[in-house]
């Protein structure tokens, strides 16, 4: 008989954002006259910019002509995009990443999910709490986590991110092999200094560990002293893989383009202690399981690196960060403590009560959708909610007025 991967039975309920969508749909069915403002899932609300659309259109036109048609492209991505990424996102900040260390994909979610496939089932993993659920769930599926008990999986080393440590976790007190970090952080919006990030790199070097660094929100950093890439830290190219996306800075949530950086100096080890190139392993996995991002989408992504494209992306970021400022200011007035909103589009708010209860209250009384912190971590996330700045200024103002009334 055909049998299942029983690790899937260890997963907790449904995926967080699917659960939220179901609750919202039920509320709207029961209250069709009420307008709902969604500040939960981090989906952008503005259209693609003129430079991106122009490049997209031109590439689509090329696909209609036999002489300029593009069929299967290089699985790792076209050189024109990889070179633009290397020059603008890394070399311009003193990081020595080169084009062939970049793997273009259709989303950071896929990459952060799939990267764990190249590591052994016995790998000891450290994951922040709270955390983007994908990091944890994919390791549950792979059988690395053990059973779930008292709000946590038995074999995971949890890195608590709390008010006491400014939502930047401390180094683990036990030896781990694989470390997930995300800055600016999702969900908390917290950031890390270069000195703070160096401590993690030094730990990884000393323990022959690897850091998986999710930098999907780096474009929202307003403080020039903060690192945008882990490769700004000396030695990180030997112990870190970085993930980035065009989803938020360029509005590609529905277009789908991202990339992963695997430096050639980055190594992992077999059971006998022999080193192996993670670049070679990821390339093998990538080429086996992925056929590449479409040519028009890669041309659209490359347009974000033109002078016009950069200016347009900055305008998008400024638009959402202005919204974040409004959210934070409103909760200052209400007396709710929070983190984020300064270098991140997310505001992590202490709701002073159970996360799901606060979620239900805001939905029923204010018609506003947030994300309950417990969905990111039942221990350190419960009691908080995440509000996203991805919406129009008009809706943000309206939502804040409703929240103020509901909490009065």
From Swiss-Prot:
Keyword Phosphoprotein: no
Pathway assigned to this chain's UniProt record: Amino-acid biosynthesis; L-lysine biosynthesis via DAP pathway; LL-2,6-diaminopimelate from (S)-tetrahydrodipicolinate (aminotransferase route): step 1/1
Any one Gene Ontology BP term: lysine biosynthetic process via diaminopimelate
Catalytic EC class: transferase
InterPro entries: Aminotransferase_I/II_large (IPR004839), DapL/ALD1 (IPR019942), PyrdxlP-dep_Trfase (IPR015424), PyrdxlP-dep_Trfase_major (IPR015421), PyrdxlP-dep_Trfase_small (IPR015422)
Matching Pfam families: Aminotran_1_2 (PF00155)
Cofactor(s) essential for the protein: pyridoxal 5'-phosphate
Cystine crosslinks: none
Signal peptide boundaries: none
E.C. number: 2.6.1.83
Reactions the enzyme catalyzes: (2S,6S)-2,6-diaminopimelate + 2-oxoglutarate = (S)-2,3,4,5-tetrahydrodipicolinate + L-glutamate + H2O + H(+)
Positions bound to pyridoxal 5'-phosphate: 72, 108-109, 132, 186, 217, 245-247, 256, 291
N6-(pyridoxal phosphate)lysine PTM positions: 248
Subunit structure: Homodimer.
Family according to the record: Belongs to the class-I pyridoxal-phosphate-dependent aminotransferase family. LL-diaminopimelate aminotransferase subfamily.
Known role: Involved in the synthesis of meso-diaminopimelate (m-DAP or DL-DAP), required for both lysine and peptidoglycan biosynthesis. Catalyzes the direct conversion of tetrahydrodipicolinate to LL-diaminopimelate.
This protein's name: LL-diaminopimelate aminotransferase
Native species: Desulfotalea psychrophila (strain LSv54 / DSM 12343)
Gene: dapL
């Amino acid at each position: 008989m055909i049998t299942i991967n029983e690790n899937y039975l260890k997963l907790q309920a449904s995926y967080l954002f699917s659960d939220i969508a179901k609750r919202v749909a039920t509320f709207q069915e029961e209250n069709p006259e009420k307008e709902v403002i969604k500040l939960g899932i981090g989906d952008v609300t503005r259209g693609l910019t003129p430079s991106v659309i122009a490049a997209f259109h031109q590439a689509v036109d090329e696909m209609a002509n036999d002489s300029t048609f593009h069929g299967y492209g290089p699985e790792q991505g076209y050189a024109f995009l990889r070179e633009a990424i290397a020059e603008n996102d890394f070399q311009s900040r003193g990081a020595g990443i080169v084009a062939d260390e970049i793997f273009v994909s259709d989303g950071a979610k896929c990459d952060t999910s799939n990267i764990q496939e190249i590591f052994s089932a016995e790998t000891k993993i450290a994951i922040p709490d709270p955390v983007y659920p994908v990091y944890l769930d994919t390791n549950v599926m792979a059988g690395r986590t053990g059973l779930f008990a008292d709000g946590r999986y038995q074999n995971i080393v949890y890195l608590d991110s709390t008010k006491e440590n400014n939502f930047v976790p401390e180094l683990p007190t036990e030896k781990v092999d694989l470390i997930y970090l995300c800055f600016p952080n999702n969900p908390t919006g917290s950031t890390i200094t270069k000195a703070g990030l160096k401590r993690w790199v030094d730990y990884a070097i000393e323990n022959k560990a690897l850091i998986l660094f999710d930098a999907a929100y780096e474009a929202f950093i307003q403080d020039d002293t903060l690192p945008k890439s882990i490769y700004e830290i000396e030695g990180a190219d030997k112990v870190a893989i970085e993930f980035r996306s065009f989803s938020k800075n360029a509005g590609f949530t529905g277009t789908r383009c991202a990339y992963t950086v695997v430096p050639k100096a980055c190594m992992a080890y077999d059971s006998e202690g022999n080193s192996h190139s993670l670049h070679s392993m990821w390339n093998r996995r990538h080429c086996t399981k992925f056929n590449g991002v479409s040519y028009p989408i890669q041309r659209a992504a490359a347009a974000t690196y033109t002078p016009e494209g950069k200016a347009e992306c900055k305008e998008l970021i400024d638009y959402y960060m202005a919204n974040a400022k409004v959210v934070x200011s409103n909760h200052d007035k209400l007396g709710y403590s929070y983190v984020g909103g300064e270098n991140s589009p997310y505001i992590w708010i202490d709701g002073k009560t159970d996360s799901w209860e606060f979620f239900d209250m805001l939905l029923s009384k204010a018609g506003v959708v947030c994300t309950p912190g417990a969905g990111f971590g039942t221990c350190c996330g419960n009691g908080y909610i995440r509000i996203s700045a991805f919406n129009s200024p008009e809706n943000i103002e309206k939502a804040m007025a409703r929240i103020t009334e509901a909490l009065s």
